[in-house]
Amino acid sequence: MAIVGVPGWIGESAVNETGQRWMDAAMREVRVSVPGWMSSMAGQSKEIHYSIGASNSYNKDTLINWIKAQGSTPVVITITGNIVSQSTGVPCLDFPSSLTNAYVTLIINSGVTVYGRGGNGGSNAAGAAGGNAINNGIGTRLRITNNGAIAGGGGGGGGGNRGKLIFGGGGGRPFGAGGSSSHMSSGATAGTISAPGKGSVGEGSLSAYTGGAGGNVGAAGGRCNTQGNGTEYNGGAAGKAVTGNAPTWTKVGTIYGSRV
């Protein structure tokens, strides 16, 4: 909540916002110049707000660097559009233990999802694991209000072989790449923001043989199927929704994958 505007009971509102009864102390809490007029606090907040819009390849370091620049000041991060990690090797959002903020509030808006990236499908190999959505290194100082969803990336589908047939697994949701294949009637497909990819399908009379399907969010990829007549590899493991230390859950909301 911000301090009320003009006209309004700024003094009372400033006390409620900052917990400080001396106005010079309240001014410092909301980062306005001292000495100064009480009206300079109108609309100010003890917390600093930051919003993140939609991105299919979000770089976690962008947020980390901004949070660190605020020092010990509490911050409120609002996710306003779907965001997907740029790689399965890193979480979409990361709150490392080096952050010194009094607390970090994370608000995920309704209809919005924070995604780990989907794993790539295997090419005559196992599927890759999906990525994690959020890593928490600051414990209960991270306060999550999840009005939308938090989703680990789906695992990539497993590949395999049977004679000259090389099977590719489907990509995990979202955006896992499909594995390459040969002698197929249809190749493996990539995962999208809304669906996992499909495994490749054998040519001709071998159409019952398939690469593993990519995993949906929070789910492992499927195993290649050669009906026991070739080499079959497993799909990749599911990414996790929230890893690290348990946060303060103001609202858990919809979760795909494991969480702390």
Swiss-Prot record:
Chain ranges for the short sequence motif GRM 4 as given in the UniProt record: 162-173
InterPro entries: Gp38_N, Receptor-recog_Gp38
Positions occupied by motif GRM 10: 228-240
GRM 5 (motif): residue ranges: 176-182
Cellular component annotations (GO), alphabetically ordered: virus tail, fiber
Motif (GRM 8) on chain: 210-216
Entry keyword annotation includes DNA-binding: no
More details: This phage use outer membrane protein ompA as a receptor.
Family classification: Belongs to the receptor-recognizing protein gp38 family.
Protein name: Receptor-recognizing protein gp38
